[in-house]
């Protein structure tokens, strides 16, 4: 293999692809990236048996070929090369020669035969969505994905496509986030995408470009400009999320989002990694009163907000409360409550583009 490529193109591609590379694997080749030189393109792939990222960049190919090279080392070398033009060449001993300006490296590579094939699958459904919409949907829900592997199904989000509407639902047992957008698609299907995959998708999405999603029985493919991201799907039965949203609402308040975040954030100063006391919220009259008592002290605050319905005193985990509020994209939110032991519902003042639920914490005197 012998080729010339631009360092800026190579560095960006290697940086993005390397995120799918195993940091430690029983298969040594998976700690590397796969380079394939054919036609006028250099293909670059990373894969950890769960998620694979592949891209193609322009290159001047003198000799076609393939090689696997350490992702960590190759990334560092490319990032620090002195000139814009990079020459990459391999020999029959799997030695890779990297040259740029006066700098040159000789790196031991591996045969591409040792690199596992990325999955292929038969497409059962497909969807095209604007990158901006998908980015906002993932960003406003992925925070609620579980990191507890005892229930693997909830380490991903449910993508629920029906009635020309796509909903993304994430739940971890303490909070739930739902975001929906209308799409030009008649399919009715559901699939569960790992949270890790969604995080990688976020880093690649361009707001102006459409993302093409191809779904199979066990895998999903996201086509994002020059990048292809293939991931396994999570298998199992996801919670009937619609039934978990309380129907009754005894108390409602419309609140300025930024003011609410600031108040809860101030209460959070009394909590930390080893201290977790509930933020006590009293909805009454024309205000919401906040307090927090922990082993290091006490704090009190209040904000103005018209409260409709019954007065209620309720406690929440400060981090869960803040996560929900910080992923809202409206200036005001509606808070709905059904007593002190039922989940809090956060929605837009108008419409239903998002729903966030936060399960309360028991208060000692409630």
Model feature map: region roles:
Residues 1-366:
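Structural preference for solvent-exposed beta-strand-turn elements
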């Amino acid at each position: 293999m012998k080729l010339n490529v631009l360092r800026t193109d190579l560095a960006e591609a290697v940086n993005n692809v390397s995120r799918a590379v195993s940091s430690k694997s029983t298969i040594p080749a998976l700690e590397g990236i796969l380079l394939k030189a054919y036609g006028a393109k250099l293909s670059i792939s990373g894969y950890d048996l769960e998620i694979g990222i592949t891209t193609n960049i322009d290159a001047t190919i003198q000799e076609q070929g393939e090689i696997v090279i350490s992702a960590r080392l190759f990334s560092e070398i490319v990032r620090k090369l002195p000139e814009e033009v990079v020459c990459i060449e391999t020999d029959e001993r799997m030695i890779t020669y990297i040259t740029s300006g006066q700098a040159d490296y000789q790196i031991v590579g591996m045969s591409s035969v040792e690199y596992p094939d990325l999955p292929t699958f038969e497409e059962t459904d497909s969807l095209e969505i604007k990158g901006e919409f998908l980015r906002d949907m993932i960003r406003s829900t992925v925070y609620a994905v579980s990191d507890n592997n005892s229930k693997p199904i909830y380490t991903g989000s449910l993508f629920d496509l029906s009635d020309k509407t796509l909903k993304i639902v994430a739940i971890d047992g303490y909070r739930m986030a739902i975001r929906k957008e209308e799409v030009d698609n008649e399919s009715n299907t559901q699939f569960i995408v790992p949270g890790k995959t969604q995080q990688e998708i976020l880093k690649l999405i361009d707001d102006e470009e459409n993302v093409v999603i191809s779904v199979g029985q066990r895998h999903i493919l996201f086509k994002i400009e020059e990048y292809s991201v293939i991931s396994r799907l999570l298998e199992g039965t996801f919670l009937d999320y619609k039934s978990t949203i309380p129907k009754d609402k005894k108390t409602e308040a419309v609140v300025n989002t930024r003011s609410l975040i600031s108040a809860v954030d101030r209460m959070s100063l009394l909590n930390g990694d080893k201290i977790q006391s509930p933020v006590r919220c009293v909805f009454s009259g024309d205000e919401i009163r906040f307090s927090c008592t922990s082993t290091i002290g006490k704090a009190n605050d209040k904000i103005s907000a018209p409260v409709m319905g019954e007065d209620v005193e309720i406690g929440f985990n400060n981090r869960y409360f803040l996560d929900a509020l910080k992923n809202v994209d409206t200036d005001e939110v509606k808070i709905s409550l059904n007593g002190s032991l039922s989940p809090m519902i956060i929605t837009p003042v108008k419409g239903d583009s998002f729903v966030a639920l936060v399960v309360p914490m028991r208060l000692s005197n409630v």
